[in-house]
A protein has these predicted regions:
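Single conserved hydrophobic/aromatic residue that forms the stacking wall/gate
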Residues: 1-11
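Donor nucleotide-activated moiety binding/catalytic core segment of transferases
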Residues: 71-117
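Short acidic active-site motifs
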Residues: 55, 88, 92, 157
Length: 204
């Protein structure tokens, strides 16, 4: 698989993912990764998948500012030398969601309207989401009210939510199960179909 080739040994390790992030929230996410790394909570690997992969090298510079070593997904650098892998290709998100212990969905800590929760939910990754989700308001509200995703409003809450899911297997399982129940209940519904359509339309 593409992911196993690009992530090597990390393919078999726990992945902490931030997906579809935008320029204005990258520093928030990277600083959250730094805080978690300093706590030494887990033996996994941080993965950052920006909404626009062409920004990957800019994200490496931000990592350096925070004292974190990073590598691009397409780079064969050893994982022993890096803290974060930055995804700079398309076509690997399904595999990432399957491997992720927990996923923050970007575009939601800033006023971009969020992104589709259905994919990470389908693959069983517990979901964290920011407050700015007006593009997907109905489905996000259902996820939050059904305890199928955790709402985070800032960096501190993001760190706390990542930590909670990493440390609490019951919480992780509950979030994943509740999200899958929503998808099962809504299968074929207009809301689910519109979620995919809106994510394509607002891919900016």
């Amino acid at each position: 698989r593409l992911l196993s080739r690009g992530l090597g040994d990390v393919y078999k390790r726990q992945v902490i993912l931030a997906a579809s992030t935008h320029k204005e929230e990258d520093e928030i996410v990277i600083e959250a990764f730094k805080d978690l790394k300093q706590e030494k909570l887990f033996q996994g690997h941080f993965v950052l998948a920006p909404r626009h992969p062409e920004r990957a090298k800019d994200l490496q510079n931000i990592c350096l500012r925070f004292g974190l070593n990073s590598r691009l997904y397409t780079n064969k650098q050893s994982f022993d030398d890096v803290d974060i892998t930055i995804i700079n290709v398309i076509g690997v998100m399904d595999d990432l969601f399957q491997r992720s212990r927990v996923t923050f969905m970007g575009g939601s800590l800033i006023k971009r309207g969020g992104h589709n929760l259905i994919e990470p939910a389908y693959f069983g990754s517990p979901i964290l989401i920011g407050p700015h989700t007006f593009n997907f308001e109905e489905i996000v509200d259902e996820f939050i009210s059904s305890d199928a995703a955790l709402l985070v409003r800032n960096k501190i809450e993001l760190v706390n939510a990542y930590r909670d899911v990493i440390q609490d297997e019951n919480l992780a399982t509950s979030l994943s199960s509740n999200a899958k129940n929503i998808i099962k209940k809504r299968r074929g519904s207009t809301v689910i179909q519109l979620s995919y359509i809106m994510d394509i339309i607002r891919n900016k």
